[in-house]
Design a protein with these regions (language model features):
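Short hydrophobic/aromatic beta-strand micro-patches
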Residues: 48-50
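Long, contiguous binding/interaction regions
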Residues: 1-38, 54-59, 72-74, 80-82, ...
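Short beta-strand segments
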Residues: 42-46
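Post-Walker A helix-loop "phosphate-sensing" segment adjacent to the P-loop in P-loop NTPases
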Residues: 69
Length: 133
């Protein structure tokens, strides 16, 4: 039983690293969805954010990749959508990272589709800076 808890803990830590990578590249509206209680979920966590333009979306993807690689040595199993950078998906098995252009995020509404998951708001560096003013 302890082995399973460690695995879940590792996936949550990985999701938080992804969120940190997003925040480092000024990703917008960063959300973690905990899907562990959903039997049919394809992964333990979704980590979702938006970018302003395709180059911003690509930069966020690069930031997530670098942050996770530096901290854990892990590479994603697969990255989809990097070429057009409207919706990039990074599959790390235990977590899946979604980086959208704002309008694509509104169109696909992943947070609504997976509303049974527990939404975990991420406190970002930009939010901390704004609250100090």
């Amino acid at each position: 039983m302890a082995k399973i808890k460690a695995k879940i803990s590792e996936s949550e830590a990985l999701a938080k690293l992804a969120a940190l990578g997003m925040d480092n590249k000024k990703g917008l509206d960063i959300v973690m969805l905990d899907l562990r209680e959903i039997e049919s979920a394809p992964t333990n966590f979704f980590v979702i954010c938006s970018g302003n333009v395709p180059s911003h979306v690509s930069a966020i993807c690069d930031g997530v990749f670098e942050t996770i690689k530096k901290a854990t040595g892990l590479n994603p199993n697969r990255i989809e959508g990097y070429e057009n950078a409207e919706w990039i998906l990074m599959d790390y098995f235990d977590i899946v990272v979604h980086i959208f252009l704002k309008d694509k995020r509104q169109h696909y509404r992943l947070e609504e589709l997976w509303a049974d998951g527990k939404e975990i708001k991420i406190e970002t560096n930009s939010a901390k800076s704004n609250s100090k003013e």
